[in-house]
Amino acid sequence: MSDNNYNTAQEFLDLIKKSRKGKFKIYIGMSVGVGKTYRMLQEAHTLLRNGIDVKIGYIETHNREETQALLEGLPVIPRRKLFYKGKELDELDMQAVISLRPEVVIIDELAHTNIGGRKNNKRWQDVIDILHAGINVIS
């Protein structure tokens, strides 16, 4: 095989690998409470109604009744329970997300710092791993 053929094949393989990565949609708001999480949940319902395998990976409702109500009817991946400094805390279960392989996963609180000892220090790093697994993320 000539070098030219190899380069062409390698470029094509790189393109295939790139296309297998998940797509990332992010909601940005000017301040807390403007409706980012609410809008993500509305979108999740629309996707589900259209036959898309969408799951909730992590949502923080901040005890807002309207936001909590929007979780009704959406499949939720259970959070991973971890103990840290004597307290039980809930975290995104990145491995469960990757194992379940939904078409789309909703992940809130992108800037969150993970509990020490995890693979990634920040939730946004978890999202990158999920995208590399070919799962689309809305955050």
Annotated model-derived regions:
Residues 1-15:
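N-terminal pre-Walker A segment at the start of P-loop NTPase domains
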Residues 7, 11, 20-95, 99:
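Conserved P-loop
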Residues 23-25, 130, 138:
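ASCE RecA-like P-loop NTPase motor cores
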Residues 53, 101-104, 133-139:
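Loop/turn-to-beta-strand initiation segments
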Residues 60-65, 104, 111-112, 137:
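Conserved nucleotide-binding/hydrolysis micro-motifs of P-loop NTPases
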Residues 69-70, 119-120, 128:
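Charge-rich, low-complexity amphipathic helices
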Residues 109-124:
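Conserved ATPase-coupling elements of RecA-like P-loop NTPase cores
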Residues 125-132:
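Conserved catalytic/switch belt of AAA+ P-loop NTPases
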